[in-house]
Structures are given as structure tokens and as C-alpha cells.
Regions:
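Early extracytoplasmic/lumenal segment of secretory-pathway proteins
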Residues: 24-95
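Mature extracytoplasmic/periplasmic domains
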Residues: 281-342
Length: 368
């Protein structure tokens, strides 16, 4: 989710595995191995942690929960800190992937937004295994001028922008992208169809596949991070993306002086709301360092720095006073209560349904 990190990755970027850089680990060495989403930490945050604690951070990135889950279920990843989304954390807790947090080592939990913690506890009973990092929505992000040229009355605040074939077809020539996240996109298309976004009904799955196949000819690609730069560069004009990613793309376009205006709306039908949490794998080699890092992320000034750059709402209550007004006052990041009431948390799926969903998603991606 979510590339400042491309320009600041601390330590060595891992291509094969963390051990390729660490050469073996011990619990006492000043090392921390982090596996996080791309585009998901503000510039300087990792450097500041390294300077403050004298700990070398090896930082690797992924761009889908499915990639993270594969590594976690295999075990022996050598990662100390990972950032799964709520439903995946929930399922992986059941599989014994994570260890309970030692809250005595996390004094900054006192800053946690209790409302956010209550909402994310559906994935994380008692908030024992994960700490809220960011919460996000997904919806249409678009190039204002190009959309207006092709459809002056485009329903820019609606899921119709993506899932109505008669609408999305108008933008195929300027490029449309969609997130490569089968569970979240299933929820979004079911919401568009007026169905339960967390349904595991086979009838709903078939209806969702029909709706997705109807728009497939108009989708240029399916990817969870490429669209950020492509929106900023004008390579595409519409993406079903994460709120903060679209806003990061907007900032990049402004910084580059390209004259590209991008916008994001939480769909009026509602949106999938997801929580990303920081967790510690059961076999993490550097437990103390992992807790130090999580506690560092919970500092209000650090949480605000991340939100100010990433354009996502964080789970840290006092950080609000440190936020830029452009972030704290943006309804696409911190929506008003009536909009927030329409946000639906994505729930974990059974393994049997997940297999069916993944097969359907493969058919959608390949167009077959």
C-alpha cells in the first residue's frame, strides 16, 4: 500500500532474503529486519531510528498481502517487523504466524487512538498481536482534466467510474488501472452491485466475476503500486487505488510541475476500509529491536510525519495536532462521520473461499 521508500531504503535492500545481507543473525546484534509495503514510510524516519538507537535497519518491500502471506506461512523469513492488513493478520494469527506483543516494551501504546484500536480488534483480539499503523480506503483516483474531457458529467464520486462498463469504457484510451488485491476488489465490486462486500456466497462470487469480466477490456493493467507514478506522469488517467497513494501521486505531479491535477473521492456507495498493523513474526530474531521500532512508530511526531507524507490516517491520537492541515482537513483521509459510517471493514476469508477467489482473480487478470 502504499515511493518515498525507494529513495531512502536503509541498510541493504534484500533481493533474496534478509540473511543475504545479515549473514546470519543473533538476538543481541544491533540489527532490525523490516518487511513493509512499498511507498509506506516517510523519508528520514528509518534514518532517525538508526541514529537514535544505533540499530542497522535492513528494509525490504512488498506490494500485496498475498506475497507477505506466502513468506509468513513458509516460516523462517528472518523478518522482525512486518505490516499485514487486518484480514491477513487475523488469518495468520490463527496459523500461529505471529507472537504476542510485549506491551511492557511499548509505553507509547498510551498514544493509541482507542476508537481505531476497537475497530481493528476484529482482526486482532485484545490488540495482542498488532499495533495500528495506518487505516485506508480504496476508490477511484483520476486525472481531473482528462476525465472531464471525455465525460463532463462523470460520476467521479461513485464506484461506477470503475465497475460500470459504459462509464469506464470512455477512459480506456487514456489508461485505467486496478489494484491487484483480490479480496479488497471483490468487496468493492460487491458493494457496487449492492451486495454484502464480505460475502462468501458462490452466487456473489460469480456475480462479481461477471462484473469484472465486463470491464476487463478497458483495464490497461492490474497492479498495486505502479499506478502511483503513472497517475503522476499522465501515463494513465484513472485507477482504482488506495486513498493515500492517489494523494501521493498528486503531490509528485505538483512537485514535477507537470500541470496534472489528480483527485480522489471515497465512493458514495461506501468503500472498503482496511487497517494495516505492525506485527512481529513468531520466529523474529531480534525481539527487543522489533519492540523498539514499533514503539518509535507510535510516537506522535513520527506517526504524524508518516501521515503527512503518505496521506493516510494513522492510529495515533495525539499525532493529530502534528498533522499538516492539508492532511487533517482532507475528507478523503479523515472522512466526516456520515461518510465514515459507510466504510466497511474487510473480513478474513476462509481458506476454501480464498482458493476460489484467487482462481477467479487469475482469470480476470489474464482476461480468460
Amino acid at each position: 500500500m502504499r515511493d518515498p521508500v525507494r529513495t531512502l531504503i536503509a541498510g541493504c535492500v534484500l533481493l533474496v532474503g534478509v540473511t543475504a545481507c545479515t549473514g546470519g543473525s543473533t538476538a543481541t546484534e544491533p540489527v532490525l529486519n523490516v518487511y513493509n509495503w512499498s511507498d509506506y514510510v516517510a523519508p528520514g524516519v528509518i534514518d532517525d531510528f538508526e541514529r537514535e538507537y544505533g540499530i542497522k535497519v535492513n528494509y525490504d518491500v512488498f506490494d500485496s498481502n498475498e506475497v507477505l502471506e506466502t513468506k509468513m506461512l513458509m516460516g523462517h523469513s528472518n523478518f522482525d517487523v512486518v505490516v499485514p492488513s487486518g484480514p491477513f493478520l487475523q488469518r495468520q494469527i490463527t496459523a500461529g504466524v505471529y507472537r504476542k506483543l510485549d506491551k511492557s516494551l511499548l509505553p507509547n501504546l498510551k498514544y493509541a487512538d482507542q476508537e481505531v484500536a476497537r475497530e481493528s480488534a476484529v482482526y486482532n483480539p485484545g490488540n495482542e498481536y498488532g499495533v495500528d499503523y495506518m487505516w485506508i480506503t480504496s476508490g477511484p483516483g483520476y486525472n481531473v482534466a482528462r476525465i472531464r474531457e471525455r465525460m463532463p458529467d462523470a460520476p467521479v464520486d461513485s464506484l461506477r467510474m470503475i465497475f460500470d462498463p459504459q462509464v469506464v469504457a470512455k477512459f480506456a484510451d487514456c489508461g485505467v488501472a486496478i489494484l491487484d488485491t483480490p479480496t479488497e476488489m471483490l468487496g468493492a465490486v460487491l458493494m457496487y452491485l449492492g451486495r454484502n462486500p464480505n460475502s462468501e456466497s458462490l452466487a456473489d462470487l460469480k456475480a462479481a466475476e461477471s462484473a469484472l469480466m465486463a470491464i476487463r477490456p478497458y483495464i490497461r493493467y492490474v497492479h498495486s503500486s505502479r499506478y502511483i507514478d503513472d497517475l503522476a506522469n499522465g501515463e494513465i488517467c484513472l485507477a482504482m487505488g488506495w486513498s493515500g497513494d492517489v494523494k501521493q501521486a498528486h503531490d509528485r505531479a505538483l512537485e514535477a510541475g507537470r500541470g496534472i491535477e489528480l483527485a480522489y473521492h471515497i465512493p458514495r456507495e461506501g468503500a472498503i476500509r482496511n487497517f494495516d498493523l505492525v506485527a512481529i513474526p513468531a520466529d523474529a530474531p531480534h525481539l527487543k529491536n522489533a519492540h523498539l521500532f514499533i514503539n518509535f512508530l507510535l510516537r506522535p511526531d513520527i506517526a504524524a510525519r508518516n501521515s503527512n507524507v503518505l496521506k493516510y490516517a494513522n492510529g495515533d491520537d495525539p499525532s493529530f495536532e502534528h498533522l499538516n492541515s492539508a492532511v487533517s482537513g482532507d475528507p478523503g483521509i479523515y472522512p466526516p462521520l456520515p461518510v465514515r459510517a459507510k466504510l466497511v471493514p474487510e473480513l478474513a476469508k476462509t481458506s476454501q473461499f480464498t482458493r476460489l477467489l484467487n482462481r477467479m482473480w487469475t482469470r480476470f487478470k489474464t482476461g480468460e
